[in-house]
Amino acid sequence: FFSSILDGIEQTANEAGYNILICQTGEDVQKEIRSVQTLIGSRVAGMLVGVSKQTAQLHHLQEVLDNSIPLVLYDRPCPSLPCDQVVSDDYMGAFNAVEYLIQTGKRKVMFMSSSFQLEVSRRRYQGWRDALMRYHIPIHDNMIVECDTRSGAIIATPRILQSEDRPEAIFCVNDDCAAG
């Protein structure tokens, strides 16, 4: 996912006469904060940031704006920040995917999610839930499994598929879960 984003960013930046600096944080919020502070100190012309899963406080990103550095967020929305944001319509994506599964005859569609602290997880959950509700399919607690890593999904999936009340389909909130 991120490599295809970087290809587009690099091509567009080069065409406009800019070079790019890449800071990978590995979903580590402390690395994210240090990287942002380093880039501010380097007086970059702008920043494109995909915030980590654990980013709850946005002070370091507000500091970017306070220094009049253009900021664009991608992937995970932060509605409280007054900057441009490029994100998917997580709600409709989930709704449409689950509706498709229902229309192909699947009625027991499990939701495998990362933490509900993430806006993306909440929106995808709402899309999943609303699709089931539209088709009058009851939602039970055992239809929701919290898991946001490939290794976690590798452990959880066999247990889910061997259960008596196993789902007919699993909607995964991210690629890591789906790969597990």
Over which residues does each language-model region extend?
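A short glycine-rich beta-strand->turn/loop micro-motif centered on a GG-aromatic cluster
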Residues: 22-26, 50, 74
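Intrinsically disordered, low-complexity polar regions and short flexible loop motifs
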Residues: 47
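Extracytoplasmic "Venus flytrap"
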Residues: 1-3
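Structural motif
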Residues: 50-52, 115
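Short beta->alpha connector loops
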Residues: 26-29, 52-56, 176
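Bacterial carbohydrate/catabolite-sensing allosteric modules
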Residues: 8-21, 34-43, 58, 65-180
